[in-house]
From Swiss-Prot:
Pfam families: TMP-TENI. GO terms for molecular function: magnesium ion binding; thiamine-phosphate diphosphorylase activity. Mg(2+) binds at D69, D88. Its EC number is 2.5.1.3. This is Thiamine-phosphate synthase. It is an enzyme of class 2 (transferase). It comes from Methanococcus maripaludis (strain C7 / ATCC BAA-1331). Condenses 4-methyl-5-(beta-hydroxyethyl)thiazole monophosphate (THZ-P) and 2-methyl-4-amino-5-hydroxymethyl pyrimidine pyrophosphate (HMP-PP) to form thiamine monophosphate (TMP). One of its GO terms (cellular component) is cytoplasm. Its cofactor is Mg(2+). The lineage of its organism: Archaea, Methanobacteriati, Methanobacteriota, Methanomada group, Methanococci. The gene is thiE.
Amino acid sequence: MKFKDKLKFYVITDNNYSNEVVSVEEALKGGASSIQLRMKNSTTREMIEVGNELRKLTLEYDALFFVNDRLDVAQVVNADGIHVGIDDMPVSKIKEIAPNLIIGASAYNMEEMKTAESEGADYLGVGAVYSTNTKLDARNLGIDGLKSISKLSKLPIVAIGGINHSNVQNVLECGVSGVAVVSAIVGAENILKSAENMNELIKKYIK
């Protein structure tokens, strides 16, 4: 299975909602195919401790494991990849240091899409499709913006930003390779059930 096939149901952690290890295990049981560790206000030691646990779980469930921003942590916990924003370490530099990592890059517009592609990103995280409480500085791209980038980009696209069970169909109709979800899964009262339901919706569009 190519890595692109595992981008379809991409869950990002947020300990404001739930414990990373608990929420990830439930999400994986429910069908999540990629996990990203995002711990913005934690120490490096904490990130490594949690990352080691998530690495074990993702291997057990045959899912991809990404670390947000932190190349050092991604390498220490033996992650499959890293996801970076436009203000983080350049994709080209990461490829020099860690050529085996899958590199995802955030793109909020065409210019950032072109930069990520030219630097050698493996996939794009495109959004915010809808307004979101989990990333308050995110710029809203909207469905039309997502469609435009999807048509022009040669890379697999993971849509992100405010995606939930009621709007995911509109996102999937844009022809993306996957959807990244935060609060709709890790903030759910029943994470397992929420993940199972989301997985069923995604499978209607991405086999």
